[in-house]
Amino acid sequence: KLLDNPELSSARLCSYVKGPDFPTGGQILNTPEELKNIYITGSGAVRLRCTWEAGPETRSTKTIHVTSIPYMVNKSQLVERIADVIIARKLPPLLDVKDLSTDEVRISLELKHDADELMVMAYLFKHTPLQTNFAVNLTCLVPTEQPEVGRPERLDLHQVLWHFLRFRL
């Protein structure tokens, strides 16, 4: 679209760019307006949270399966942090954590039968890396009159894409 209409504003480009795409998945908590503001100003933070689902229940336990984790979160360290919460008994309804991942992320949390899943997840979002902020800073080296010297500058979405297209063409 930018090649067809070089005058497109960053605000208009945001209608084509829905939001950041993180390789580990996760849920973006920012509103569309907040994401648009990040693209227009060239800085901000994207709030990321794991995705999870309730698993099967037995008579004595409930299960939660974490199916994706925020970008740049080390899965084994995350499991250790959750295990530390269990060992310290900071969250009594949480009984066990298991990493059942193969090609895809799957962390199993075992809860007491009468536990409130939302309360457990809210605690884990606050006290573990299951919810994080990912800083966005669109600072780039912009070409100057001297081809071998670039000048750092914070850019908006339009400027980043325009400089990229000029570089590639």
Language model: regions and residue ranges:
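C-terminal interaction appendages of subunits in large macromolecular complexes
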Residues: K1-L169
